[in-house]
Amino acid sequence: MRFWNHHCDVAGMPGLTAYAGFTQVARPNKGDFVFVSAASGAVGQVVGQLAKIAGCYVVGSAGSDEKVSLLKTKFGFDDAFNYKSETDLGAALKRCLPDGIDIYFDSVGGATLDAALLQMRHGGRVAVCGMISQYGLEEPYGVRNLYCIIGKTIRVEGFNVNGYFHLYPRFEEEMAGYIKDGKVTIVEDVVEGIGSAPAALIGLFSGKNVGKQLVAIAGA
């Protein structure tokens, strides 16, 4: 089955990033407790759904109540929270994941990574594909809780999708089946016209988009 209509999202780099990071870096086990930051984004929404397929309990964070609702009603997350309305990220994680975190799929870094490290379970895995909260900062956030990776024997691994292109045939076959069976659904954020591109780009860094941000060009 071909699904080229999704080549900008789940069939392209966002989907392969989610697939490679979750299956090859995080290496899930059935029953794992999974936390996904930027969960309503193009990568995060796929990670969450793959986690559910793998039999995991999944919690996501997002930047609005609308996105939180989408995670739970559209993408099947077990729980979610709006990080912008939380005064204590650690408390939010403890509330949603009282038994701790086995897998943290990190796209934001900074304070969220710091809070997640404290909640990680022994032998936990952190798959790091982005640090969007840190891009462009004059003074990047200094992560304070790295000591947790020693006492809890946490494996923290950064990865780039470029190292996993060899998985594409297998990924394509599996993902096409998930979409056909309704196990994976996708939401895109599409704006019309090249004139909308600058605002759409800026919106990426303030969390305005839901899913993959696309610009539709007339006649394309």
Model-derived segments and their meaning:
Residues 40, 44, 48:
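N-terminal Rossmann NAD(P)H-binding glycine-rich loop of SDR-like oxidoreductase domains
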Residues 79-84, 189-196:
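Short acidic-hydrophobic, aromatic-tinged amphipathic segments that line or gate anion-handling sites
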Residues 14-17, 42-43, 111-112:
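Hydrophobic/small residue at the entry helix of a nucleotide-binding pocket
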Residues 1-38, 183:
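NAD(P)H dinucleotide-binding glycine-rich loop of Rossmann-like/cofactor-binding domains
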Residues 52-115, 138, 162:
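Adenosine-nucleotide cofactor-binding segment
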Residues 24-29, 50, 96-98:
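Glycine-rich helix-loop-beta junction characteristic of Rossmann-like nucleotide cofactor-binding loops
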Residues 181-190, 198-220:
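C-terminal capping/lid region of NAD(P)-dependent oxidoreductase domains
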Residues 111-184, 217-220:
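Glycine-rich phosphate-binding loop and adjacent beta-alpha segment
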